[in-house]
């Protein structure tokens, strides 16, 4: 009971992290589609990640923007401070709510599938074929205006970059190592894991316009999409760890620059664990 009280006390403190701006700069402003922000003298703001949307995708998927492709880099601390796709799921689910406001987002799987099918181990494309999105959008034209998502999750190429959310200070070596690891993650280890990666990025960028014009993909683009597109399969088996020992041993053999000799588990934090359990329970209800 004491442990639950301690966890709830710390979790309650997090709830109070709301910024109140007064006067509200939008008060009385009738421009735009929504007038809810203009009704009150004060403006209440909080971290956008409070609704699990750690990747700020919502502004980019507005139909008026006519965005063809979005590069989504996920540095969430979902489990063991690694991402498991939960941010993508949150944006996908939001389109079915009132707050979705006419936005469309490609199909994505559950968190376990993200891990089991290794969708966080390499860049993954979602929404590769607009014709498969018409059940979401209602028409093919609207599907063409739904951006293709190039999803890349934080991974340890040369540094264990799953630092705690509560770590506020980094020395220069840590900073440089995290930046280097980010470059290696985004570039497929500077193209050493896939020499065609630059071309594959280009294929993702032009895909929607090709579909609008009825232009068939090149053979190289077809290879890229075969390699990186999520094929719709799922594996909902629960996984306890983001990395299995075999994966860690492989990384050790491949990259001699890893900072630690073993997996660096983020120190136990009751608030993080409570939020994780809440997410799991909510998902299965």
What are these regions (language model features)?
Residues 1-281:
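Catalytic domains of lipid- and phosphate-ester/thioester hydrolases
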């Amino acid at each position: 009971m004491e442990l639950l009280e301690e966890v709830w006390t710390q979790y309650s403190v997090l709830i109070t992290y709301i910024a109140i701006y007064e006067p509200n700069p939008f008060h009385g402003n009738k421009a735009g589609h929504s007038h809810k922000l203009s009704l009150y003298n004060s403006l209440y703001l909080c971290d956008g990640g409070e609704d699990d949307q750690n990747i700020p995708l919502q502004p980019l998927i507005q139909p008026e923007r006519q965005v063809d492709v979005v590069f989504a880099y996920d540095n969430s601390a979902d489990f063991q401070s690694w991402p498991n796709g939960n941010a993508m799921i949150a944006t996908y689910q939001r389109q079915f709510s009132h707050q979705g406001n006419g936005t469309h987002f490609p199909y994505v799987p559950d968190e376990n599938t993200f891990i089991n099918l290794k969708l966080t181990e390499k860049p993954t494309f979602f929404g590769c074929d607009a014709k498969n999105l018409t059940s979401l959008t209602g028409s093919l034209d609207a599907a063409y205006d739904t951006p293709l998502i190039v999803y890349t999750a934080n991974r340890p190429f040369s540094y264990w970059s799953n630092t705690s959310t509560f770590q506020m200070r980094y020395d220069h070596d840590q900073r440089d190592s995290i930046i280097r690891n980010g470059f290696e993650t985004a570039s497929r280890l500077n193209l050493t894991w896939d020499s065609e990666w630059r071309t594959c990025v280009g294929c993702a960028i032009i895909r929607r316009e090709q579909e609008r014009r009825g232009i068939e993909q090149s053979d190289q683009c077809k290879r890229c999409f075969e390699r990186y597109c999520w094929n719709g399969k799922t594996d909902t088996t629960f996984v306890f760890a983001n990395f299995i020992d075999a994966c860690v041993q492989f990384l050790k053999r491949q990259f001699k620059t890893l900072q630690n000799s073993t997996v660096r588990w983020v120190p136990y934090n009751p608030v993080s664990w409570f939020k994780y359990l809440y997410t799991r329970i909510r998902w299965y209800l």
